[in-house]
A protein has these predicted regions:
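N-terminal low-structure segments adjacent to metalloprotease catalytic domains
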Residues: 279-405, 678-721
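Short, surface-exposed patches at the edges or C-terminal ends of soluble domains, predominantly
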Residues: 3-283
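Post-HExxH zinc-binding segment in Zn-dependent metallohydrolases
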Residues: 159-162, 538-572, 657-670
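Long, well-structured alpha-helical subdomains associated
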Residues: 507, 558-658, 672
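Contiguous, non-catalytic segments that form substrate-binding/exosite surfaces or channel walls
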Residues: 337-497
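Short pre-active-site segment immediately N-terminal to the catalytic Zn-binding motif
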Residues: 496-513
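Active-site recognition of the HExxH zinc-binding catalytic motif
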Residues: 510-526
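C-terminal, non-catalytic "cap/extension" segments appended to globular domains
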Residues: 627-721
Length: 721
């Protein structure tokens, strides 16, 4: 057995397709195409030319392989010998093209079309362990002398002896060139960007009742036989199998007909996802901090001090013993000293934070001040992958603990080379993506950020850096989006499913999204200070600003994709699903500006028809989604552009009218009654005071989603990868 790359005769050593090497090459998965069992289709164009000199395309699967490689797969061929566990060890997907005796087809001329018993066992074991298998059958299947049916039968499918004809739904008026019809509301979206697929002299498939199978393509009601299965997807143990009733549709002379190529890529993606799906729920190994005595001693002391501290971080001697607080602080300082050698690169910060902690004690545990040490905490100056940083401050955690308690956290910087290269284009010197190594209770919450302004200081600290916990962002997104997918019966394209199952891919996606989003706050036509969190403005202004940055990032993915960026398509799914499924139902209903942004996006997509909510099932018109999101981005940008010539009050009103054009306001809203009911001649705060806590209630879709996913949302508290 050898592996050969397409358009090459060089033998590839097994070490060259090791998973770690593939990760560096950023390939989706490894596809192995069998060419050792007298296949009627050749991957090698030279072999195809020998098989059919007059029309090599009628014997070639070269374009089949090249399409997969262009999509991000590695494609190799198995050209000699038996299919064994060793032969399959470097593959994620095995493709078995139609095979035949020489009596019926011109073939590659290698091996027997009959799989040996040991091969059948090896292939089944490969699937059980999480492999993907594609079996390509044919019309009048039994006559070709292969035993693909024996293999397909192990997964509950049979390729029947038939030829489908359709005089109404066919290609080029040929009755045997039938157009398949897709089950649009299937578990997986094999019809993603497939308007039509043509099969050429197809057989039909039969499925046993016990198989965990889904028929995703059938013949039409006008065909003979009518509504017969043409494509079947099976989930078998940890693996996946697809059986097709035709092999011609992926040949070189047919793969570019209709949307046959896209169908092949959808199938390949779904099969490849078996491996990521099997690993989706695995937790990463615990970090060193989980068992480190020094860190655990620090956590113990911090948690013991937590109930002593007031909201501002001080400790009231009338309620709590300062002697006990002092003893606990000694334990904190001792633990910091013990941990210091592990963070030698932070020696200046650690020395300063010890002084700040001691000054807190000497000041009678009054309101703490960590300004001096915060100025020396600079993770932005050492953005290298896997660099760990230690921090201890009196601080609140955004979307977590609102009180300025003493908190300790150890972070690991996520800064792979590819991200460093991206930052050269999307420059953002303050951006520091991080992962959790260890944390105290303030981060056992929904908080996924670490910002300087959360720290207790005597004056506003310099904004040198902003930390984003990409592991938490990715993990909670995956959990909520998967639950929403199941609840809403949403069929997912293969790329979207891969994103939801792959933690590292999701982290990479969120980091690039965050990088572009964050810098967008200071770019564009800005009728106000975008960093307005401390200003008193209507909460829909915050909603529009956060939404603007996400919409702009979504649009930028089209630029990235044109440049060949592998993450662009995943970013679009992440922005769409996080905004639609998680944001609106996370947090309370008190002026929830992030939630409102998701409500606006849903309303626009529903209004334009890019999103449909019918029969309690959610569906997207994926081509329309992109255009609709870009349109919404342009509308928000126009609102901003025109706002430069408006007063602040006029912009608030214009923004309100924009939002209410999509999201219905509360029936009791004063703002909704019109400008004549607002105190426009008074102070602006009077206008803000009239805003209801839930000015824009959840619609019936989100009301249902909120009730049914409440436990899932709650379960993401404190989540890590």
């Amino acid at each position: 057995m050898v592996f050969r790359r397409i358009q090459s005769v060089r033998v590839i050593a097994k070490s060259e397709i090791h998973p770690q090497s593939e990760a560096k090459l950023q390939k989706i998965a490894r596809i192995l195409v069998d060419q050792a069992h007298n296949q009627a289709w050749a991957i090698d164009p030279l072999v195809a030319a020998k098989m059919n000199p007059a029309n090599p395309a009628d014997a070639s699967y070269e374009q089949f392989a090249l399409a997969a490689e262009a999509e991000g797969f590695t494609v190799a061929t198995h050209t000699t010998g038996l299919i064994t566990a060793e032969a399959l060890s470097g593959a994620d997907v095995l493709v078995l093209p139609h095979a035949s005796t020489d009596e019926w087809e011109k073939t590659v001329g290698s091996g027997s079309p009959v799989l040996a018993d040991s091969e059948l066992e090896a292939i089944e074991a490969f699937v059980v362990a999480g492999g993907g298998l594609l079996i390509l059958g044919e019309t009048e299947q039994p006559k070709y002398g292969n035993n693909l049916n024996e293999l397909a039968g192990r997964f509950g499918v049979k390729i029947a002896n038939a030829t489908v004809q359709d005089t109404e739904r066919n290609f080029n008026d040929v009755p045997t060139w039938i157009l398949g019809e897709f089950e649009r509301l299937s578990d997986s979206d094999f019809a993603y960007r497939v308007e039509s697929a043509c099969l050429y002299r197809a057989g039909v498939l039969e499925v046993t009742p016990t198989a965990k199978a889904e028929v995703f393509m059938r013949s039409s009601e006008h065909a003979a036989p009518a509504a017969a299965a043409l494509g079947v997807a099976v989930k078998h143990e940890a693996g996946r199998v697809v059986v097709m009733a035709d092999s011609d549709l992926f040949g070189d002379d047919s793969i570019n007909d209709c949307d046959n190529k896209q169908l092949w890529l959808n199938i390949a993606g779904w099969l490849a996802n078996a491996r990521t799906a099997a690993l989706a729920n695995l937790k990463r190994p615990a970090t060193w901090a989980a068992t480190d005595a020094k860190w655990l001693s620090l956590v113990e002391a911090v948690e013991a001090m937590r109930p002593m501290q007031s909201k501002d971080g001080s400790i009231d001697a009338a309620e709590h013993s300062h002697d006990e607080a002092s003893r606990l602080l000694d334990q904190v300082l001792a633990a910091v000293d013990a941990l210091a050698p592990k963070f030698a690169h932070q020696s200046a910060y650690i020395a300063a934070v010890k002084v700040d902690l001691e000054n807190w004690r000497q000041g009678g545990f009054a309101v703490p001040d960590f300004f001096d040490s915060l100025e020396l905490f600079r993770p932005d100056l050492d953005r290298r992958n896997d660099v760990e940083n230690f921090a201890i401050f009196s601080m609140y955690t955004q979307n977590g603990n609102p009180n300025r308690n003493l908190e300790a956290v150890i972070t690991k910087t996520f800064w792979p080379d590819w991200l460093a290269a991206k930052e050269q284009k999307y420059n953002n010197a303050a951006f520091v993506p991080i992962e959790f190594v260890g944390f105290t209770a303030g981060y056992d919450t929904n908080s996924a950020v670490f910002f300087p302004e959360t720290v207790a200081t005597r004056s506003v600290a310099t904004y040198y850096w902003g930390g984003i916990f990409c592991d938490r962002e990715a993990a909670r997104f995956r959990r909520v989006a998967k639950a929403a997918k199941e609840l809403l019966y949403l069929p997912l394209p293969a790329d979207a499913e891969r994103l939801l199952n792959d933690q590292m891919l999701a982290q990479e996606t969120f980091v690039l999204w965050d990088l572009i989003h964050d810098r967008t706050h200071s770019r564009g036509d800005l009728p106000f200070d975008p960093f307005m969190i401390k200003q008193r403005m209507p909460f829909w202004m915050y909603a529009l600003e956060e939404l603007r940055c996400d919409l702009s990032t979504f649009r930028e993915t089209l630029v990235l994709e044109a440049e060949g960026d592998r993450l662009a398509k995943y970013m679009r799914y992440a922005i769409l699903f996080d905004r639609l499924f998680r944001f609106p139902i996370t947090g309370g209903r008190v002026r929830n500006y992030d939630g409102l942004g998701g409500q606006i996006m849903f309303a626009h997509l529903h209004k334009t028809g890019a999103l449909q909510w019918t029969d309690n099932r959610l569906a997207f018109d994926w081509d329309a989604v992109t255009a609709a999101i870009v349109e919404l981005c342009e509308q928000v940008e126009a609102l901003y552009h025109d706002g430069i010539n408006r007063s602040r009050l006029a912009q608030w009103i214009a923004a309100y009218e924009f939002v209410t054009g999509l999201v219905q306001p509360h029936p009791a809203s004063t703002w909704a009654k019109g400008v004549e009911h607002l105190p426009t001649d008074g102070e602006l705060k009077g206008m803000v005071n009239l805003i209801l806590d839930d000015e824009f209630p959840l619609n019936v879709f989100y009301d249902t989603l909120n009730r049914k996913l409440a436990d899932v949302i709650a379960s993401t508290k404190g989540i890590t990868a």
